[in-house]
Design a protein with these regions (language model features):
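Active-site metal-binding loops of divalent metal-dependent hydrolases
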Residues: 14-17, 55-57, 85-86, 119-120, ...
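Binuclear metal-dependent phosphoesterase catalytic core
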Residues: 4, 28-31, 35, 179, ...
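Metal-dependent catalytic neighborhoods of phosphoester/phosphodiester hydrolases
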Residues: 23-24, 53-73, 88-101, 127, ...
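Acidic/histidine-rich helix-loop elements
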Residues: 14-33, 59, 88-101, 122-131, ...
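Active-site-proximal beta-strand elements of phosphoester/diester hydrolases
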Residues: 7-20, 111-120, 150-152, 205-211, ...
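N-terminal active-site segment of His-dependent metallophosphoesterases
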Residues: 1-69, 160
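His/acidic metal-ligating clusters that form di-metal
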Residues: 37-50, 126-208, 242-244
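A short, structured active-site edge motif that brings together acidic residues
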Residues: 79-90
Length: 260
C-alpha cells in the first residue's frame, strides 16, 4: 500500500466474456486471450496491490463465475468485481465475495478512495446509474472530501466518438458528472464496455476506457468491427499527492482465430 513515495498499484481488467467452457467471441479465443493477460499481470514487478474487474466478466452464463474464480484466485491479490450488461449481479454477489474475490464497493486508503459503481441495467446493453449508486458516490465524496478519488464502472459515462458504441452509454451520465464536478479531488473515471482504449478529459477529471481481455473493437468504425489488436489491461499508480499514472499493456501475440 502507498507510503510517502510508493504508489498504490492497481490493475484493471474488463470484458472477459468467460463461458463455462473454452469459447470464441467474434473469432477470438476468449480463454487464450485472458490467459495471456493474466500471465502478463503475474509477471509484473512490483506486483499490484489489487485488481479491479469492471464488468462483462462472463458471457451470459452465470455458471461461469466458478471458472472465473479458478482463473483469478492464483493471482494472489484481491479482485474487486463489478457487473456489466452480460453479468448476473445477484449471482456475482454470492459467488465472488470470499477468498481473494471481493464485492466491496467503496475502498478507502491513506490518501485515496475508490468508488465502484454498478451501471448495469437488466435486459439492455445501455448503462444506468440507479439512485442508490449515485447516493453511494455522493456520500463517499462528502464523507472523504480530502481524499483523491478514482471512480470505476462498466459503461461509458459519456460518448467516446464511436457511433454505435455511443448508443450504449450511461443514460444518466450527466447526473454522475453533476456529483463529480462538486468535488475537486476527483481525479479520474475509468470504465470498460467499449472493448477499446480511450483517453479523455472533462474539466479537471481524467477519463479512461480500457481494452477487453477478449475481442477488440475498432473505435473508428461506424458499426461493430473487430480490431486486430491483442487483448489488454490497464495499470494505475496512485501517488499520495494525487498524481495518477496509467497505461495500457497488450500482451503478444494477438489471439484472433481464423475460422476453419
Amino acid at each position: 500500500m502507498p507510503t510517502a513515495t510508493v504508489p498504490l498499484r492497481i490493475i484493471q481488467i474488463t470484458d472477459l466474456h468467460l463461458k463455462t467452457k473454452p469459447s470464441q467471441l467474434w473469432g477470438v479465443d476468449v480463454d487464450a486471450s485472458l490467459n495471456a493477460v493474466l500471465a502478463h499481470i503475474q509477471g509484473r514487478n512490483p506486483a499490484p496491490d489489487f485488481i479491479i474487474a469492471t464488468g462483462d466478466l462472463v458471457g451470459d452464463e452465470p455458471e461461469a463465475y466458478g471458472r472465473l474464480r479458478e482463473l483469478l484466485e492464483p493471482l494472489g491479490v484481491p479482485v474487486y468485481c463489478l457487473p456489466g450488461n452480460h453479468d448476473f449481479p445477484a449471482v456475482m454477489g454470492q459467488v465472488l465475495r470470499s477468498g481473494s474475490m471481493r464485492w466491496e464497493r467503496h475502498l478507502v486508503f491513506d490518501n485515496w478512495q475508490l468508488v465502484l459503481l454498478d451501471s448495469s441495467f437488466p435486459g439492455t446493453p445501455v448503462g444506468h446509474l440507479a439512485r442508490r449508486e449515485l447516493a453511494l458516490l455522493d456520500t463517499a465524496l462528502a464523507v472523504h472530501p480530502d481524499l483523491h478519488t478514482l471512480v470505476c464502472l462498466h459503461h461509458s459515462p459519456l460518448p467516446v466518438g464511436t457511433t454505435w458504441l455511443d448508443t450504449m452509454t450511461v443514460v444518466n451520465g450527466e447526473a454522475l458528472f453533476a456529483i463529480l464536478e462538486r468535488y475537486p479531488r476527483v481525479q479520474a473515471v475509468v470504465w470498460g464496455h467499449i472493448h477499446a482504449e480511450f483517453t479523455g478529459r472533462r474539466g479537471n477529471i481524467q477519463l479512461f476506457a480500457t481494452p477487453a481481455t477478449s475481442v477488440q473493437f475498432n473505435p473508428d468504425a461506424p458499426e461493430p468491427k473487430v480490431d486486430e489488436l491483442p487483448p489488454g489491461y490497464r495499470w494505475f499508480e496512485l501517488y499520495p499527492d494525487g498524481t495518477l499514472k496509467t497505461g495500457v499493456e497488450r500482451p503478444e501475440p494477438a489471439t484472433r482465430l481464423i475460422a476453419a
